[in-house]
Amino acid sequence: MQDVVIIDDTEINLILFSALIKKLDNCRSHNFESPIQALDWAATKQPDLVIVDYMMPGMDGLEFIQRFRALEGCQEVPILMITANDQKQVRYRALDSGANDFLAKPVDKVEFLARAKNMLSLSAARRKLADRAEWLDSEVKKATAVI
């Protein structure tokens, strides 16, 4: 099961994005109105995808990304930033801060699902590579112990 964290201070957006994620095979969403709550959750579990709003009270999406990327194991987790502000400067700042992709509101459902699905595929491939590297490392250690 792939875990998708959704962070948005607007409840209707959480409901919409969560319903869309449920359409994807083998996915479940973890919804948070507060970036702080999402960080607390992510500190103990590593999500496969994060969907975060750009503008939120208390902590914006940019600050969330910086804090999230500082968590152990979260440097490579794909992040999709969503905002009502579609100015190029906002996009650049979002991508420069560590977001992997960007969508402007109102979000096209088909495009949202396609981007989320692509990012989840990348996340699954990354995990498989990490597992394979760990296995190879253990095999090398076993082989060198014999020598």
Region spans (language model):
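Acidic catalytic/metal-coordinating carboxylates
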Residues: 33-34, 60-66
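Active-site residues of response regulator receiver
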Residues: 8, 53, 83
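Amphipathic alpha-helical coiled-coil "transmission" helices that mediate dimerization
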Residues: 124-146
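A Lys-centered signature of the CheY-like receiver
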Residues: 57, 105
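Two-component/phosphorelay signaling modules centered on CheY-like receiver
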Residues: 11-30
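Alpha4 helix (beta4-alpha4-beta5 surface) of REC/receiver domains from two-component response regulators
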Residues: 19, 63, 75, 86-101
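Active-site beta3 strand of CheY-like receiver
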Residues: 45-52
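C-terminal output helix
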Residues: 107-116, 120
